[in-house]
Structure formats: C-alpha cells, structure tokens
C-alpha cells in the first residue's frame, strides 16, 4: 500500500486525493492547505488528515476551529510520494526546496516547465520512461488531451504533421479574478503556443511535426481543440475505431444532443460525476473526417479533471507498482468508474 501525500488541496489536489482514496493499492496519508478556508474544513469532514503547508500559519487553522495534525514537515517523511497541487511556479519551488531536501518522490503539475523534472508523464506515451523515476511533471489538461488523440491516430497511421487550434476556457468556474468576460484573446499571440512543445516533451517523435495556436474565450466549462493531422494513410472508419479503442476518449454525437460543451458537462452531471468531472476527453464523431489522408476532428477537454487518472497512473509508475501501463490504466479507470 503506497502512502501518498497531497501537498495543496485545491482544484487538482482535492480531485487527486479522492481518486487515490478509491484505489486499493494506495492511500492518502494527509493533505495540506495554506489557509483555513472551506476546502480545508471539507478535507477534514471527508476524513483526510490535514496539515498546514506553511508552518507559520498553523495557528490560523487552530484559531478558525479547523483541526490540523501538524505541518508539512511532520508528515512528509511518512510519504512514499507527494503529489504537488500548488499553483504555477510554486511546484518547482516545492520540488527544489522541500521534496529533494527530504528525499521523497514527487509529481508536479503541468503549470511547471518540462525541464523542471526528470520527464513529462502521460499514461499512454511515457509510462515506461517515468517508471521508477523520482521527480516527474504531469502535463497539463490540454497536453493530456492532445496526447490521447495523437495516440489514437498514431495507432493506425504515422503522423506526418499536426496542426491544432486550441479554444481555451477563460477561467475555472470558481475563479472570479480571471477573464476575459467580453473578448477573444490570442494566448499567446505568437505561434506556436506552448502546447506543441509540451506535447513533444511527451512524444519526442513529433518534434518538428506539430504546430499549435491558442485563443481564450469567455467560458468556464471546457477547452476545445480543432485538430488537423497529416498521416501516412488512413480513413474515417479506422480513426473512429481507433478513438473507440483508446482509453479515456469518448466519442459523442451532436445528433444525440451533444451539440456543445454545455451539453457534455450536463452529461457528466447526469452520470452523477463528483464536481461534474469528465476525466475522459470527448471527440465529436461527426467532426471526424479524412481528406487525402489528413485527419480532421474536434474534441472537448474538461480542464479540471482529465489529468486526475493520469496522476494515479504516474504514482504506480514512479513507485514501480505496475510495469504495464495498460493494466494500470484499466485498474485506475475501474476504481474511478470511468466509461473507458
């Protein structure tokens, strides 16, 4: 049984904690928070042992009436691995100043740079490379989604060139500080966006073959990708079959009511998913087309949750708990109740 510590019980951290708690080969030994907010209170109510991420703030939790077991320093030595859920740039600082200092394995999230860790993780592409490693970066929600669809396409044809336009959500639903509210923003205005190089950090064979551009639009529900991939040769039926066989990809039909990201999220709600999470990415079947061996399709990414099962698989890889990535994926999916 692997002892997992969640450092940063926020948007990603709380989801990873719940996912780990559902596995039969790992357990959450504690979670940390920097301030005594409602998430800290709910962590305790869920039965997680709560620790102050910043020792000097421990008294704030006590004054707020939220019981804490101690500080990060009090629990980190008991962890086999730490999943870092800190905001962008803080993960790198934690890696250098905390995890390496204590000699504990750690996963940092996709807001950090590829060079900040030993490798970049995706369950389908880099499980073997990350096996037994000490410090790994779990790539972002967009990169995770692109890696899944590239895997499906690559399973039936060689990828010669990939062009992707990313339509990114402006902010998460709980974020009141980020926009835009009434604009479409190139993000970045330069091409390529960081997403292409990030995919290459997972799939080196796409170096020089992938180009991405991105814009932000006023929505909070999901990202969307418009994908165009030149291949060595395939057809629509092969691509649809490959998508159906690839873990954590759902094919949806606009003709069945899935005519927007709002309807996809409504589907997640109707499934009874916690926080309406959709760990799988959704590809519109009608959007799949192949013209002169070039694949076209559109997919939607739930930015808060598609990386969650990958974190669980990454734990198994780094702790050498399962050598077969597909077996880990199957085990994780079953525990989380994923469709595929």
Swiss-Prot record:
Superkingdom: Archaea
EC number: 1.2.1.59
Subcellular location as annotated: Cytoplasm
Residues the record marks as active site: 141
Positions with a binding annotation for NAD(+): 11-12, 111, 169, 303
GO biological processes: glycolytic process; lysine biosynthetic process via diaminopimelate
Annotated CDD domains: GAPDH_II_C, GAPDH_II_N
UniProt keyword terms in alphabetical order: Cytoplasm, Glycolysis, NAD, NADP, Oxidoreductase
Single GO term (MF): NADP binding
Catalytic reaction list: D-glyceraldehyde 3-phosphate + phosphate + NADP(+) = (2R)-3-phospho-glyceroyl phosphate + NADPH + H(+); D-glyceraldehyde 3-phosphate + phosphate + NAD(+) = (2R)-3-phospho-glyceroyl phosphate + NADH + H(+)
The keyword NADP is annotated on this UniProt entry: yes
Keyword Isomerase: no
One family name in Pfam for this protein: Gp_dh_C
InterPro entries in alphabetical order: DapB_N, GlycerAld/Erythrose_P_DH, GlycerAld_3-P_DH_AS, GlycerAld_3-P_DH_cat, GlycerAld_3-P_DH_NAD(P)-bd, Glyceraldehyde-3-P_DH_2_arc, NAD(P)-bd_dom_sf
Gene Ontology cellular component annotations, sorted alphabetically: cytoplasm
Pathway in which the depicted protein is active: Carbohydrate degradation; glycolysis; pyruvate from D-glyceraldehyde 3-phosphate: step 1/5
Binding residues for D-glyceraldehyde 3-phosphate: 140-142, 195-196
Family per similarity comment: Belongs to the glyceraldehyde-3-phosphate dehydrogenase family.
Subunit and partners: Homotetramer.
Protein name from the UniProt record: Glyceraldehyde-3-phosphate dehydrogenase
Gene that encodes the chain: gap
């Amino acid at each position: 049984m692997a002892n997992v510590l969640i450092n940063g019980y926020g948007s990603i951290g709380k989801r990873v904690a719940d996912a780990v708690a559902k596995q039969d080969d790992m357990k959450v030994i504690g979670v940390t928070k920097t301030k005594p907010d409602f998430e800290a209170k709910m962590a305790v109510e869920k039965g997680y042992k709560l620790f102050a991420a910043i020792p000097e703030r421990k008294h704030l939790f006590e004054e707020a009436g939220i019981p804490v077991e101690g500080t990060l320093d009090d629990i980190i030595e008991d962890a086999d691995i730490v999943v870092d859920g800190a905001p962008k740039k803080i993960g790198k600082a934690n890696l250098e100043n905390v995890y390496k200092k204590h000699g504990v394995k750690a996963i940092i999230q996709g807001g950090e740079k590829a060079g900040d860790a030993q490798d970049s993780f995706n369950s389908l592409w880099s499980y073997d490379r990350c096996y037994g490693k000490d410090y790994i970066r779990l790539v972002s929600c967009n990169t995770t989604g692109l890696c899944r669809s590239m895997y499906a396409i690559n399973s039936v044809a060689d990828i010669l060139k990939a062009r992707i336009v990313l339509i990114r959500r402006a902010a998460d639903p709980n974020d009141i500080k980020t926009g835009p509210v009434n604009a479409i923003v190139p993000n970045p205005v330069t091409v390529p966006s960081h997403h292409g190089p990030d995919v290459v950090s997972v799939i080196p064979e796409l170096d020089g073959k992938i180009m991405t551009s991105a814009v932000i639009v006023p929505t909070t529900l999901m990202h969307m990708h418009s994908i165009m991939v030149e291949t060595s040769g395939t057809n629509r039926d092969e691509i649809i079959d490959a998508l159906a066989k690839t873990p954590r990809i759902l094919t949806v039909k606009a003709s069945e009511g899935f005519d927007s990201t709002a309807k996809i999220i409504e589907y997640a709600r109707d499934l009874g998913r916690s926080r309406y999470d959709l760990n799988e990415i959704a590809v519109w079947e009608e959007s799949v087309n192949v013209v002169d061996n070039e694949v076209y399709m559109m997919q939607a990414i739930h930015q808060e949750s598609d990386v969650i099962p990958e974190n669980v698989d990454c734990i198994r890889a780094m702790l050498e708990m399962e050598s077969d990535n597909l077996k880990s994926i199957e085990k994780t999916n079953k525990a989380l109740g994923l469709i595929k």
